[in-house]
A protein has these predicted regions:
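Aromatic (tryptophan-biased) beta-strands that constitute blades/sheets of beta-rich domains
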Residues: 1, 7-26, 66-82, 107-132, ...
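Repeat-blade elements of multi-bladed beta-propeller folds
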Residues: 1-8, 22-68, 80-102, 125-150, ...
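A short acidic/small-residue loop/turn micro-motif
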Residues: 26-27, 85-86, 118-119, 345, ...
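Short, solvent-exposed loop/turn and secondary-structure capping segments
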Residues: 31, 54-56, 194-197, 329
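Short, isolated positions in well-ordered beta-strands
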Residues: 49, 96-97, 103, 111, ...
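Ordered, small/hydrophobic-rich secondary-structure cores
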Residues: 112, 122-171, 176-178, 308-317, ...
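Extended, hydrophobic interaction surfaces within ordered domains
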Residues: 162-210, 353-354, 358-370
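Compositionally biased, intrinsically disordered or flexible polar/acidic segments
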Residues: 210-370
Length: 370
């Protein structure tokens, strides 16, 4: 008796003549149903209040939010399912993006990818930590949105949310791709958030990507199959082979991939960052990997398997650099894995030769049931 049945109509855009009509129950589309169409698919969904509702999202209060897709030619239902998205969806080509997930436009099947650590197939998702007013906008290859500041996502590179500081979009959709540029039109007047920056800002593309990203993945990052860590880095990034290097310590935020671990340093030790663009490089095609480091590291503990996963054997490769031109014998590293020293596992970076940056590797294996 309380069903919200509406009549969905398709009209010929030239003549205005009725092509088809279909009664549809829109109860699970909320109080403000909306529609969009692409590639012959009509998508019906609900528009809900904008705001910072992560607590409600994780509590499952949005689980009943439904999306329905109809064939635009005859009104036949292609699919209808509860998606539980956070803000209004958008379409890019044949993909429906319903934050934080993505779906095949014509089938509703969830888009998936391999987890960069476990190798298991997981749902594609992205993170929008911090203040995240408004809904995303998009171009064929990018998502644009607020995440603390200006946030954007390279859908082709697919390595996480990137940020541009000191600017922020307004409270709705004003960060827009236009003619090869990214335009943030003024939309802050009357907003009471910090740094309203009342003005229009236009960004043009650059040839060299120097941005760090925050990758998102569901669940535990165990058991580990392949883990590439970039110690001290400001974010995540893929190398030329496509391997995703994860920053450690991990950036924090809702839906950002988390790792269970702990680092301990000798006196004066710390994670540090530099700028690879201005550093001499040798022996690597990814100098950004050596623009950060764990200096004076005494111990790094990482959770590779969970209790009950059984025994696992791993091979470990470590990268070293010599950025301070120290003399041989001044900075000798002894490598201990699982409490056991490894034969020949002493590294003296100044003796390795090459250039300003070095990237030798040390290998070893051990078992871990903890």
């Amino acid at each position: 008796a309380n069903a919200k049945v509406r009549l969905v109509l398709c009209l010929n855009k030239s003549s205005g003549q009725l092509v088809w009509q279909k009664p549809l129950d829109l109860t699970e589309l909320g109080d403000t149903p909306a529609a969009m169409v692409n590639n012959g698919v009509l998508v019906l969904f609900g528009v809900y209040l904008d705001g910072h509702y992560w607590q409600q999202f994780f509590a499952g209060q949005f689980a009943g939010r439904r999306v329905t897709a109809l064939d635009g030619h005859d009104g036949k239902q292609l699919w209808s399912q509860q998606v539980g998205y956070r803000v209004r969806p958008l379409i890019i080509g044949d993909t429906l993006h319903a934050e934080p997930w993505a779906f095949d436009l014509k089938t509703g099947e969830a888009q998936k990818r391999a987890h960069p650590v476990t190798g298991e197939e997981e749902r594609w998702q992205f993170a929008r930590p911090g203040h995240h007013c408004g809904a995303p906008s998009a171009s064929p290859h990018m998502l644009f949105f607020r995440s603390w500041n200006l946030g954007y996502y390279d859908l082709d590179g697919d390595y996480g949310t990137m940020h541009f500081g000191a600017q922020r979009p307004g409270c709705w959709i004003n960060f827009l791709p236009v003619g090869g540029l990214a335009v943030m039109a003024e939309a802050s007047t009357g907003c009471m958030c910090d740094f309203p920056n009342q003005g229009t800002v236009v960004f043009q593309p650059v040839r060299e990507n120097k941005a760090w990203a925050w990758f998102s993945a569901p669940g535990l990052a165990t058991p580990v199959k392949d883990l590439a860590l970039n110690l001290g880095a400001l974010g995540d990034r893929r190398d030329a082979s496509g391997k995703l290097w994860l920053a450690y310590p991990r950036p924090s935020g809702s839906l950002v991939l988390a790792l269970e671990g702990e680092a301990a340093f000798y006196a004066g030790g710390r994670f540090s960052q530099g700028e690879s663009v201005y550093a001499e490089t040798a022996g690597t095609d990814a100098p950004w990997l050596f623009s950060s480091a764990a200096t004076g590291l005494r111990k790094l503990s990482l959770r590779l398997v969970q209790p009950g996963d059984g025994t696992a054997t791993y091979r470990v490769r470590l990268g070293f650099s010599e950025p301070v031109h120290s003399a041989p014998g001044q900075r000798v590293f002894d490598i201990v894995l699982q409490g056991q020293g490894k034969p020949g596992a002493s590294i003296d970076p100044p003796t390795l030769g090459g250039g300003f940056w070095y990237s030798p590797t040390i290998t070893g294996s051990w078992s871990d049931e903890r």
